[in-house]
Amino acid sequence: MESIASSYRPISASLDHYYLRRPRLALALILIGYVVAATLYAVITPDWQNPDEPAHYNNIAYIAAGHGLPVLHAGDYDQEYLNALVSGGFPPHLSIASLRYEAYQPPLYYIAATPAFWLGNGNLLFVRLFNVFLGAVSLLLLYACMETVFPTKPLLTVGATAFVAFLPMHVAMSAAINNDGLAELLMLATMLTLLRWLKRRFYRSVAFSSSRTDSFERRTLLLLGVLLGLSMATKIYGYAAAPLVAGVVLLTVWLAPAAQLDQRLARPTRQNWRRALGAALWVLTPALLLTLPLWLRNLQLYGAWDLLGLQMHDRLVAGQPTTAAWIAQEGFVTYLERTMDFTFRSFWGVFGWLGVFMEPRIYTLLLAFTGVLMLGLLWALVRFICGRPEADMDRYQFWVLGLFGVMVLAVFASFAWYNLKFVQHQGRYLFWGLLPISAFVALAWRELMQPLQGKLTGLMARRTGCSAGGRRPAH
């Protein structure tokens, strides 16, 4: 075991800088590549040939015309008419004005996109390019998040950024009109603030409890709450992040961890618990105050307890296929197969209104690539179990990876919850978790660049491929 560990331990210390000497240059090239690719998507994609794009556009047009915030009404969703538009390629003689079924969405994105609408006099491309800009800012924030946690591991920072920048479906959605772009940006800004606060907590000095430091911490937590509230005012999945962020703050203040693995966690005390509750309230209070007006408005418009307008939305979209009806007609096994297959494909790329697929062999290659990444994560897990120096990480980085793991679980849980009602096996609904997902992708790929792990993974992949093909390669 010692001989195996020693075979890769020396190179692991300089692995990142061996392969990537100028990470900022790589980041610049990634940004340029993303902007070019996303702009081409925005220009070439025919009008309205993105999921729900007309309904999002109509929300912006409604605000730009001076009518105030959109309101969801009966008749704003007509499944037959929508099917006719999609199947006909949105012919010019059929109006999109009646597609207003996204009016229940939180309004911040539509308000932010209104100047782009005015600047282009309602031109679709101008608003699409606004989303391309949001995507570029999001990439910078994602890189900053990764660099905050792994400042000496550019393979992780650059790798995660590159994965998100060139994920085909994500590029397509970043070049379309929707509220996902601003929601991702605000989510990443929230995470960057949280990760920097966590880092300061883990590497705190003895004088951490001074009044000056406490004042700085309160301002940081207040900013965290404001960003979280803005995220909740942009996309409903911001609500899923609220308990996660507040829980991390509470747990960190309560346990008072240090970065060094050889330092024990402090024994939780009642005083620490009171401080932890206070810190969590500094986050939740501004977030809730920012969203309170939206709740009151929704209660007035849509009825008691419909804080988010979801009940009104569910009543209107009666024509959408429901999960219960699908299972009753096709069977549960078929439903699971469809869930896994279509979610996988649409995560990587199913374009238009989810009807334009890539070549089948591309999905096969992506499936093989995903399998290789799983092996890379397995190698990383073995390294973490071995502990330092093989792990090459401190407690702060381990905690962040744990947080990322919980975030991935939350993303898939919200995806499963939404699919309990309607059949919505769209991989793009996982994109609000691209920070942790891309971090694990980069971690797996970095592990595979270790000589021993790479050779063993290649051997396993070849044997698996031979078994799948039913024959051994000829000598």
Q: Which role does the model predict for each range below?
A:
Residues 193-207, 214, 241-285, 295:
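Perimembrane helix-loop-helix junctions
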Residues 126-151, 189, 379:
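Transmembrane-helix motifs of polytopic, lipid-linked glycan transferases
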Residues 125, 142-166, 184-185, 203-206, ...:
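Transmembrane-helix signature of polytopic, membrane-embedded enzymes
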Residues 299-387:
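Membrane-lumen/periplasm interface segments of multi-pass, membrane-embedded glycan/lipid transferases
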Residues 61-127, 313-329, 336-337, 341, ...:
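Interfacial juxtamembrane loops and adjacent helix segments
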Residues 30, 226-227, 245-246, 265-295, ...:
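Hydrophobic alpha-helical membrane-interfacial segments at the cytosolic entry of transmembrane helices
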Residues 22-54, 61-90, 97, 282-300, ...:
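Transmembrane signal-anchor helices characteristic of membrane glycosylation enzymes that use polyprenol
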Residues 220-236, 286:
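Membrane-interface alpha helices of multi-pass inner-membrane proteins
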